[in-house]
Amino acid sequence: MGKDLTFTQTAWNEYMEWQRQDKKIANKINELIKSIQRTPFEGIGKPEPLKENLTGFWSREITKKHRIVYKVEESGTKIIQVENHYSDK
C-alpha cells in the first residue's frame, strides 16, 4: 500500500467547497485524511467497510450526515466522496 493520495474530480470539488464554506468541517476532513493515510482501516471517524455495490470502499464519519468515502489501492488512497452519506462513487 503506497502513500499517494488522489481524489476523484467530484471529491476534489466537494473538498474545496468545504474549505471555502466551513473551516471547522474542513479541519475535520483534513484530520480524517491524515488518519486514513496513517491507518486506513482504524482510527477516528468510525472507519467502516462498505458493502454490496461499494465493496472494497471504506467510509469515515465527518458529521452525522456526511462521510468521506475512500479506497485503499496498491499505489495509495483514493478519495471518492467528501459529502453526502454514500451517494455516488
Residue positions per predicted region:
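Compact soluble domain cores
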Residues: 26-39, 44
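Enriched for short, Lys/Arg-rich terminal
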Residues: 2-4, 10-27, 44, 51, ...
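Short glycine- and Lys/Arg-enriched binding-loop motifs that mark or flank ligand-binding interfaces
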Residues: 39, 48, 52
